[in-house]
Structures are given as C-alpha cells and as structure tokens.
C-alpha cells in the first residue's frame, strides 16, 4: 500500500482514516478487538477491507474483500478471465453423488456472518426438520471445529452428529474431503466447506451469503434431484477473491481494490 503512495497507520487508527483494514469478522479471541473498528467505520459508512483465510488453497491464499467476507464482500471481480483460475490447479470434479449422506455444516456463531441467524442448535433443528419434509436420507450434523454445539439427535430418524477430525499439523484443517466421499449433498450457511464440496462435485444447499450461491441449490424441495449447473464462470470469478502472499506483497489485489474504492466508496 505504501509503495502505491498510500499512507498506512498500523494499530494507531482513531476512526479518522478513509479505509480500515482488519483480519476476519470472527469476533473471537485475538480477533474480538477488531469488532469496534468494524462498527466504527461501518456506522460512518466508511469502507472496511477484510482479510481472511482462503477456501481455494487454505493457508496458502487469502481472501481480500470490501465490507465483509464471502458473498457479502465486494472483491472487485466483475471483469475476469479464465487465466487466474488455472494458477490454483484445482480440478472441478464432475458433478456426482458418491454416497447417500446429507452433511449439514455448522459455523462459528461469534462470526459477523452469523448475526441474523438463530443459535446453532436451533439452526440445525430447522434444517433437519425442513429436510425431512422431502427425504429420509441419512443426515450427518458436522459442527464447526472450534464451536461446540449440543443437539438431541435421538428425536430424529437416521440423524447423527460427527465432529470434524482436525489435522494436528494445522490450525483447523479437517477430514472434510474424506467425509465428502459418502455425501449426497452438503448444507451450509456460508462457510468454506460448501466450496470444497463444489470443487469435489457434490451439490450444495446454501444461503445468499455463500460464495457458492451461484452454483448452489436454494430449496430442499429438489433434494432428491439437486441442480448441478456449470461451474466454470463461477470458478473464474472465485479466483479473483483470493491471493498468494507474494501477490499481496506486489500490490496486485490492492490495485483492484483501490480502484473499486475510488469508484464506488470514496467520494
């Protein structure tokens, strides 16, 4: 940013800058302090750039967007081509249903993404109840690895909770890829597991806040015959939501974001 001629203050902001930059919108642990920055700037209708862990190449690439995360963010990715997607070397596996399980993925309730949703246990109950109107397929409840939730699965038929098995060599990578091998579909509000499922060819059911909304299903009415749309244009746009560290150091995402800020947010 400084190389681009911008003035940058690190941890010295008093709310008077044009733009704030924070890490994540999960108001938990060391990140909880960023909530006041978020609220100060958004209440003044000032933009906030949010940096967070990527979902295409987790722990290798990083999402950078304006005023939120996932589909709530502005990534300045309206005009794209297919070249950047190739850099990720991620195969869009053919749509398929490798198993019979419907996996409902939870999220961290301290995240700004969850602000308009009920407690996680109630959300799980709502999704199970709605699914049971249309299917008797087995349902697996999969909580967020760092967000404990209790739910009585015995009141439902063929529903069980299976927590993520965390990779001890990483912060919160899990066994999701293995779990998808038995999946018919994945249900998620807006978390990264839906993205992994789409890459793996597993249909998803998501909210408008999810980055997979464009290629996801919107209603459980078709759970026995999910839509499986073309994903290439979606992937091409997705490629401009995440960046490698060296690209960030070169100012590549900042160049796009800065122009969008000037055009749409700073007057």
Segments the model singles out, each with a brief description of its role:
Residues 1, 30-36, 118-130:
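Well-ordered, non-membrane alpha-helical segments in soluble/globular domains
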Residues 171-218:
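A donor-sugar binding/catalytic signature common to diverse glycosyltransferases
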Residues 128-170:
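Catalytic donor nucleotide-activated moiety binding site of glycosyltransferases and closely related
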Residues 61-99, 214-267:
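Leloir-type glycosyltransferase catalytic cores
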């Amino acid at each position: 940013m400084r190389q681009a001629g911008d003035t940058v203050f690190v941890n010295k902001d008093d709310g008077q800058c044009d733009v704030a930059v924070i890490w994540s919108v999960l108001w938990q642990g060391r990140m909880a302090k960023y909530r006041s920055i978020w609220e100060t700037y958004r209440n003044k209708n000032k933009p906030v750039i949010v940096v967070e862990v990527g979902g295409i190449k987790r722990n290798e690439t990083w999402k950078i967007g304006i005023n939120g995360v996932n589909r709530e963010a502005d990534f300045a990715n309206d005009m794209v081509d297919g070249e950047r997607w190739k850099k990720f070397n991620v195969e869009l596996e053919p749509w398929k249903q490798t198993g019979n399980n419907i996996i409902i993925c939870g999220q961290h309730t301290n995240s700004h993404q969850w602000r308009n949703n009920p407690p996680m246990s109630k959300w799980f109950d709502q999704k199970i109840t709605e699914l049971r109107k249309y299917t008797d397929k087995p349902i697996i409840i999969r909580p967020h690895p760092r967000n404990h939730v209790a739910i009585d699965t015995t009141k439902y038929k063929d529903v069980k909770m299976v927590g993520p098995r965390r990779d001890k060599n990483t912060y919160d990578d899990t066994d999701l890829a293995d779990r998808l091998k038995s999946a018919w579909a994945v249900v998620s509000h807006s978390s990264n597991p839906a993205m992994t499922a789409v890459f793996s060819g597993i249909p998803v059911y998501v909210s408008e806040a999810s980055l997979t909304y464009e290629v996801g299903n919107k209603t459980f009415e078709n759970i026995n015959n999910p839509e499986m749309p073309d994903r290439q244009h979606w992937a091409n746009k997705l490629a401009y939501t995440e960046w490698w560290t060296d690209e960030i150091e070169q100012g590549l995402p900042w160049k796009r974001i800065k122009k969008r800020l000037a055009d749409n947010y700073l007057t």
